[in-house]
């Protein structure tokens, strides 16, 4: 059974919400009796609203990918600090598998609950994951399209505010910061920027390594070896642009070494709606269901 439910304004057709996909199925409201054990669900409710629904689904035997942030952070104290709520189900926080196949593929396959990464963490972590455990300090400068701000209209995402402008926001206060730090195991300096495009995200990561500088060839080989078995991460030779991955589930990463100071710079691009949200959720659902990982994503 395929149900598509909405927390706000149900009883519309999907084609009226996203006409580009030509899907005429109607949005409904969630009814627990409509789900069966063994079903799969992807939950994209707002932060703090997703946790009760996810708990009900998991308790009924449904395997869930949670696209909200409600199960990403392992430290329970982080939820009131960064998201403004006390988590109602610490047991599910402890059980949830972080939904990054490039690191947790085998655990995702057997999970009851997968926490889909946030868009900024997805790009940042993929950019730095081959160096995890070797990073002394890192600065991440990230730029995202307007769709990353969600559907709720605010002054900052009006056309007249965004067009022909680039601006930083939530400096030293963005709630994706602890998620990046959790997965990389190092404190990060993270600054996000809003850019006047619909979809796409570029994270430029400047890292100093604990074991000293690497040669450019050694760095590229490190990345090529690490991502050789991961179908949606492409290691490229020149800094990629957002256009290369828009409307896809791919990430492109380009690692380079500063020949003067030895610092590693990694450019990482994703589609914030694709690999940064819905595409990643489908990739995780495929793994959980024992389907080909790239089914529906090529």
What are these regions (language model features)?
Residues 2-21, 27-169, 256-260, 295:
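N-terminal Rossmann-like NAD(P) cofactor-binding subdomain of oxidoreductases
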Residues 252, 257-298:
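NAD(P)-dependent Rossmann-like dehydrogenase/reductase catalytic/cofactor-binding core
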Residues 130-134, 208, 284-291:
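Active-site catalytic microenvironments for nucleophilic, acid-base chemistry
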Residues 119, 211, 272:
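Residue-level signal for short, function-critical loop segments
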Residues 123, 215, 276-277:
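Secondary-structure boundary/capping motif
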Residues 2-6, 11-19, 32-34, 38, ...:
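C-terminal substrate-binding/catalytic lobe of Rossmann-fold NAD(P)-dependent oxidoreductases
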